[in-house]
Amino acid sequence: MDIIPAIDILDGRCVRLYQGNYQLAETYGEDPVAVACNWAKLGAPRLHVVDLDGARQGMPVHLDALEAIVTQVPCPVQFGGGLRSIEAVSAVLDRGVDRVILGTAAVENPALIRECCERFGGRIAVGLDARGGQVAVRGWRETSEVEVTELAGEMEKLGVSAIVYTDILKDGTLTGPNLVELQRLTDAVKVPIIASGGVGTLADVLYLLALEPRGLQGVIIGRALYTGDVDLAEALRAAGPSRWQDLPPDDVAFA
């Protein structure tokens, strides 16, 4: 299972939000490029970069920082935030990003998802950011009436390469991922799932590992890495290709 550090960029800085609230952003680095290089140096197999300003404005803002990250780290980089046109997607992919993640477009413009999948193939993923089981859009500021698993099925039919699932109410809380919803999602579709939101301990990573046979491909970790609650090297040893075990903790069971 991939352990993927998150790099969220707001006003040019590396920040973490709390439950998607921009007003509660905490800065963990003034230079996102330096932060990215550090995670790559520590062995991150992939980086998850989000342009929070772009998500709010509807078009990518921090493309220079993104390009600098892509050129300076050896691992693949995936990017999301404000990708609501084929031109924006193309511009980001042209900068060397391995995979782009479209969120709002999945709800408001599925035709764009189809076009991107036809044109760019496996480099297109969607982000399903949920609040109470309903998909949120426009930088998490609005909640739609679309249910997560229903939309996931539609996106699978369009040919997306992966689905990034974020439980917004778990995001930044360090209280553990929403395992119940993740299990529902992995059971609903066959496309690889990447979990995001709530990881606060190494045990949380192992809980998620129990879902790998069901289709969980990776986990994005943000605040816990920056606070030191989760050590990247330990997480990689626990759940990466050379992991300690293939069994979850004793108190974890899935039907």
Swiss-Prot record:
One of its GO terms (cellular component) is cytoplasm. Pathway: Amino-acid biosynthesis; L-histidine biosynthesis; L-histidine from 5-phospho-alpha-D-ribose 1-diphosphate: step 4/9. Transmembrane segments: none annotated. The keyword Amino-acid biosynthesis applies. It comes from the Bacteria. Its main location: cytoplasm. InterPro entries: Aldolase_TIM, His_biosynth, HisA_bact_arch, Isoase_HisA-like, Isoase_HisA-like_bact, RibuloseP-bd_barrel. It catalyses: 1-(5-phospho-beta-D-ribosyl)-5-[(5-phospho-beta-D-ribosylamino)methylideneamino]imidazole-4-carboxamide = 5-[(5-phospho-1-deoxy-D-ribulos-1-ylimino)methylamino]-1-(5-phospho-beta-D-ribosyl)imidazole-4-carboxamide. Belongs to the HisA/HisF family. This is 1-(5-phosphoribosyl)-5-[(5-phosphoribosylamino)methylideneamino] imidazole-4-carboxamide isomerase. It comes from Gloeobacter violaceus (strain ATCC 29082 / PCC 7421).
